[in-house]
Swiss-Prot record:
The CARD domain is involved in ced-4 binding. One of its GO terms (biological process) is programmed cell death. Autocatalytic cleavage removes the propeptide and generates the catalytic subunit p17 and two non-catalytic subunits p15 and p13; autoproteolysis is induced by ced-4 oligomer. Cleaved by caspase csp-1 probably at Asp-144 and Asp-374. The active form is probably a heterodimer of the p17 subunit with either the p15 or p13 subunit which are all derived from the precursor by autocatalysis. Interacts with octameric ced-4 (two ced-3 zymogens per one ced-4 octamer); the interaction causes the autoproteolytic cleavage and activation of ced-3. Processed ced-3 also interacts with ced-4 octamer to form a stable holoenzyme. Interacts (via large subunit p17) with csp-3; the interaction prevents ced-3 autoactivation and delays ced-4-induced ced-3 processing. This is Cell death protein 3. InterPro entries: CARD (IPR001315), Caspase-like_dom_sf (IPR029030), Caspase_cys_AS (IPR033139), Caspase_his_AS (IPR016129), DEATH-like_dom_sf (IPR011029), Pept_C14 (IPR002398), Pept_C14_caspase (IPR011600), Pept_C14_p10 (IPR002138).
Length: 503
């Protein structure tokens, strides 16, 4: 992931780049440096105007991290964009751990000099180094830059606890794992390696405190849900197996950081849904096109039961999921593969999608409260839409449907999407235990699938992540808020079967 100061620098000067970049020359260099590939180039060239092509180049560089920033700086120098290169120079090949960035007004002399060298209107940060940093030779190879950037990203990990009021595991609970205090976190990527062993979660004393145990999940040992099935208000989910679950786990990328810790997510989810009665299929490290083909084949599979689960663990941005080839795929295109038109075997059946990926670069600093409250905050409560609410449509609902044999149903119905975070924000992942969101999903579902429908479960997940997890970046305490989008027409229960029962 690109450092925030570098990303902000590109964002502030986007108008300069969209006015002066020579598209063909820059693309040629970036493809030669393997920052972009030919598919990226075709996508950029398909943009309608030259200005849009220039903007898309900058956006593509932002998606590809610090290595791409340095390569972009080299490309500007080598193609005669001296003024634009001057904009990036203060942060090019800089070691973040030895520098403090801040915005400050230039002296008049410096301002006149920089205006003469660069296009008018750009802004560039000033850097003050704590220690002297040796300059990088202009003849440094791209591989050297890449290796140094990768090691630099490791040194920039945020050292903090990811859980609010977190209780440490018992001694030797994880003999092969780093302690919680030494775990590292980054938005969308974390550093270190995770164990492949399955874990389950149990609640410690006091609110929002959790302890991890190395034991199989035992959520199905409890009695099944006691309420009577009502076909008018509940989806049927009694087939054996309950259905199919596809888990796409992208860990290693061509340019973007490795998603260390995602193996723990995959193992825990595999264990969870197998115990819930699903046939689990895992696919690792898929390209953008590979994801689409895999989901398409999954949607058309002949062995579906009463419901279907799709889990995507990858890098992402708003409305896109990124494959291991760094190609972004529209989430709308993914969800369309699951609709009734493209997946007729899943028509009228609930399809639950979990997306563990960043949806932007913003970080949630939270807000102060007087005390801890378990209730849902008022700003999360949704009101009725005045135009599409029940009163507005009342007359249309009660009119008699004379001589109608078929009634139409939206093809996009019966889908629920659970996002790890809200739009434009990062999601967080622990290098040893996996992502906050998936940890909460496994804990809540293993405890309450027997007596809650999926919307209730995900509301509880929202509360667990919002109240039970946090990390720090300097003096800032950072939080995360999951989000769900429901197109379900009935309540959906997993109906887990009881095991180890005396009956």
């Amino acid at each position: 992931m690109m450092r925030q100061d570098r990303r902000s620098l590109l964002e502030r000067n986007i108008m300069m780049f969209s006015s002066h970049l020579k598209v063909d020359e820059i693309l040629e260099v970036l493809i030669a440096k393997q920052v972009l590939n030919s598919d990226n180039g075709d996508m950029i060239n398909s943009c309608g105007t030259v200005r849009e092509k220039r903007r898309e180049i900058v956006k593509a560089v932002q998606r590809r991290g610090d290595v791409a920033f340095d390569a972009f700086y080299d490309a500007l120098r080598s193609t005669g964009h001296e003024g634009l290169a001057e904009v990036l120079e203060p942060l090019a090949r800089s070691v973040d751990s030895n520098a403090v960035e801040f915005e400050c007004p230039m002296s008049p002399a410096s301002h006149r000099r920089s205006r003469a060298l660069s296009p008018a209107g750009y802004t560039s940060p000033t850097r003050v180094h704590r220690d002297s940093v040796s300059s990088v030779s202009s003849f440094t190879s791209y591989q050297d830059i890449y290796s140094r950037a990768r090691s630099r990203s490791r040194s920039r990990a945020l050292h903090s606890s990811d859980r609010h009021n977190y209780s440490s595991p018992p001694v030797n609970a994880f003999p092969s794992q780093p302690s919680s205090a030494n775990s590292s976190f980054t938005g969308c990527s974390s550093l270190g390696y995770s164990s492949s062993r399955n874990r389950s979660f149990s609640k410690a004393s006091g609110p929002t405190q959790y302890i991890f145990h190395e034991e199989d999940m035992n959520f199905v040992d409890a009695p099944t849900i006691s309420r009577v099935f009502d076909e008018k208000t509940m989806y049927r989910n009694f087939s054996s197996p309950r259905g199919m679950c596809l888990i796409i786990n992208n860990e290693h990328f061509e340019q973007m950081p490795t998603r260390n810790g995602t193996k723990a997510d995959k193992d825990n989810l595999t264990n969870l849904f197998r115990c819930m009665g699903y046939t689990v299929i895992c696919k690792d490290n898929l390209t953008g096109r590979g994801m689409l083909l895999t989901i398409r084949d999954f949607a058309k599979h002949e062995s579906h039961g009463d419901s279907a689960i799709l889990v995507i663990l990858s890098h992402g941005e708003e409305n896109v999921i990124i494959g291991v080839d760094d190609i972004p795929i529209s989430t709308h295109e993914i969800y369309d593969l699951l609709n009734a038109a493209n997946a007729p075997r899943l028509a009228n059946k609930p399809k639950i999608v979990f997306v563990q990926a960043c949806r932007g670069e913003r970080r949630d600093n939270g807000f102060p409260v007087l005390d801890s409250v378990d209730g849902v905050p008022a700003f999360l409560r949704r009101g009725w839409d005045n135009r599409d609410g029940p009163l507005f449509n009342f007359l249309g609902c009660v009119r008699p449907q004379v001589q109608q044999v078929w009634r139409k149903k939206p093809s996009q119905a019966d889908i629920l999407i659970a996002y790890a975070t809200t739009a434009q924000y990062v999601s967080w992942r622990n290098s040893a235990r996996g992502s906050w969101f998936i940890q909460a999903v496994c804990e809540v579902f293993s405890t309450h699938a027997k007596d809650m429908d999926v919307v209730e479960l995900l509301t509880e997940v929202n509360k667990k992540v919002a109240c039970g997890f946090q990390t720090s970046q300097g003096s800032n305490i950072l939080k995360q808020m999951p989000e769900m989008t429901s197109r379900l027409l009935k309540k959906f229960y997993f109906w887990p079967e009881a095991r180890n029962s005396a009956v």
